[in-house]
Structure formats: C-alpha cells, structure tokens
Design a protein with these regions (language model features):
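P-loop NTP-binding module
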Residues: 1-171
Length: 171
C-alpha cells in the first residue's frame, strides 16, 4: 500500500498498519519486518503511519532496494497508490515499475479525469497496462452506442468480457 496519505489496505484486510512502507523507506525497519502474510494466499506490505512526505519517501533509493528484493521473491507485485491527479506519489514510481493499471470508479471518475490521468502518465513516459472499471452496477442503464439494449440483463456476459477483448482504449 503506497498510499501513505489515505491508506486502506490494512483496514480492508484487518491487518495492523504499524511497521509498514513509510517506516521502511525512512530506514526504521527492514523488508522482513514490513511484509505481512494474509490468509488469502498473498503477502502484503501496508502503508505504515500516515506521512505527508510520501512523495519524497517514494523517491529514495530504498524503494529500488525493496522492489529488487520483492521481484526476486514474488511473481507479481501490485502497488496501490493515491490518485494520480491529486498528488505526485504515483508518478514518482514511473521509472521503477513495469506499468500502471488504472482503477476507474463507475459513476465517479469523469472522462476528463481519465484523460488527465493518462496525460500525466504520458508526461513521465509511464506504460499504461490497462484501465479497470470498478463499482459497476450491472442493473445500470446503458447509454450511447448500445442504448437499445436497455439494462445489462441478458447482455451482461458481453459487458463482463468487453474490457478483456477490447485492446485499445479510445476516448
């Protein structure tokens, strides 16, 4: 959880947030102390204590050391960051990670917000792996090109697979 301003992962997983990423980056503990096992089949590093200097912490050489160590241990590393358009924390990591998977909340994120996010990532030569639409209500009316279908209903399967088959996002 690299969202050290408004961390949520520890709360969602009911894990103690002490001794997390912020403490590691500040040099107060090592990787073994911050890596926590879950009953869900994955390990997690929580944010630690809330920090107003998280962008500076994420720019330290200790981030590289942590990512190197984790990449030897794990097949996949998923990093939760604050919103890209709000603070610079996420873009500080651009040259340290393979790419970004943007989480877009249905009914909350505007097309302009998404465009600005993509633009911000392009400015730092970041690779965008895809866009994930979350909090979708399958009973919501469909508007635009497919409005004649009405509610998702029997077309639900189509929409569930839409993002998987659509290789290029257009806006």
């Amino acid at each position: 959880d690299a969202d050290m301003r408004r961390p949520r992962i520890a709360r969602y997983l009911n894990i103690d947030k002490q001794d997390g990423l912020s403490e590691y980056l500040a040099g107060l503990c090592d990787n073994a102390e911050i890596t926590k096992n879950t009953d869900l089949g994955f390990d997690v590093i929580v944010s630690g204590n809330v920090s107003s200097s998280s962008a500076e912490l994420l720019a330290t050489p200790r981030v590289d050391a942590l990512f190197d160590e984790c990449s030897r241990e794990y097949d996949y590393i998923i990093i939760d960051t604050p919103p890209i358009n709000v603070v610079t924390d996420a873009t500080v990591l651009a040259d340290k990670i393979d790419g970004y998977l943007l989480a877009v909340r249905a009914g909350f994120s505007s097309v302009d917000d998404i465009k600005q996010t993509v633009h911000s990532l392009e400015q730092v030569d970041a690779k965008i792996l895809g866009i994930m639409l979350e909090n979708v209500d399958p009973k919501t009316e469909i508007y635009g090109k497919y409005s004649r279908y009405g509610k998702y209903g029997k077309y639900g399967r189509y929409y569930k697979n839409y993002c998987n088959s659509y290789s290029r996002y257009k806006y």
